[in-house]
Amino acid sequence: MNHLTVQLYVENQWHDAAQLSFTDAQQGLRAGCTLGYIPNYLVDCLDKEQSCLAWALSANLPLGWDTYSGAPVWAALQDMTPAGAARRFLEQRYGQLRPTDMAMDVFLLSQCTPAPIGHLRIKEAFELVASVPSIGFSRAEVVQRDHRFLEYAYEQGAAIGGATGAGGEAPKLLLTETADGLLYPDASMADTRAVTHWFIKFPRHKAGATDKDILRSEYCYYRAIHQLGFSTIEQNGLMLEEGSKPSLWMRRFDRKVESQHVRRYAVESIYSLLKVTEPGSYLQHLDVLKRLLNLWRSERQDAAIADLVLEYVRRDLLNQVLGNSDNHGRNTSIIRGEHTISLAPVYDLAPMVMDDEGITRTTKWPQTVERGGNVDWFAVCQLVSELADLPQEWLYQQLRDTAQQLLALPDLLQDLGLPDKTWQHPRIPLRRLQQQFTAWDLC
């Protein structure tokens, strides 16, 4: 197999949007691949030529007649394909089915991408799933991680992270609920039957006491920051199910059920935007902001730049306050709508400083302003305001105002039942937040 068809959902229908070709399928993506929009799709979208909005596969692959290759294509594909522990599980479970003339990354792309996050899918992967009868499971079976259910979920491409075994990260699942309350892997259910699209997370690793508390804390965090006005996971339906192991149930922000159809939103990670092809790569906040600013300006969103910059800096302050050190380039995304581009809601917000693996920040400010986990927020505002051509005094005052808002977090989180282990952790400053903000010159 040297070619795959990338399908794109926009204006309430799927389109055969682009053809992906491999230089050598046996050597995989590293050997090279090219991507070109399909002429019929381009003709249908003539008035959208050069657009980076929802009609494009990526902000780095604007709609047009050019053929793309290299890092922009590879980075965009990595937003779609299973990674990390999910990939390791799939390799073990289905690797023996891989043809000898096809590399594992090409095989997974062709088999395991029927309904990834966002508005893209691989046509050939979806056709494989569509040929298999769909099976629904009760919420209780999902909560209890019924073995039969997990096997089926992986076969249908519903798992985007983790593995079923006790030795690895637990799965993250993409499931669709129908009117009868049963849950199906997203790709196996017709849009006309969909009621709710769920993103479900289980504890990491072997689901030890700390892993469970991290997940419980994540639930509390979403509840609390919503009350403070941050754009985050939808509160309706947000639930922590305990069961034998806790599971966090969240409505997906890349799906919206409307009359007789499902709206799918183009979600693109910061890694993809920066053409980063190595998972876990270190980034500089200023490089991320520079790319976002260029994108906003290219789409004539200059009037929204101040809000973008403030929100970006506010979110990093929030990460520091809540001990979320896992700030790699796939934990922040943009949504490319049909009219505008925006930051995706806050997601993957958890006290990862508690994790036994010792997770550290992978996206940082320059060493002159961030050392050993301590950030000089006044200096950050100076650098960012210069980059974005904004008044430094305004940005710094807005960040101080945010700090005043965040002083409500300790009470909010305690009322929500934040685990004591999180509350007491030495690298999470919630117990001494006023003192910490004073040290940061934010109070």
Please describe what each predicted stretch is:
Residues M1-C443:
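Phosphate/dinucleotide-binding and metal-coordinating scaffold of catalytic cores
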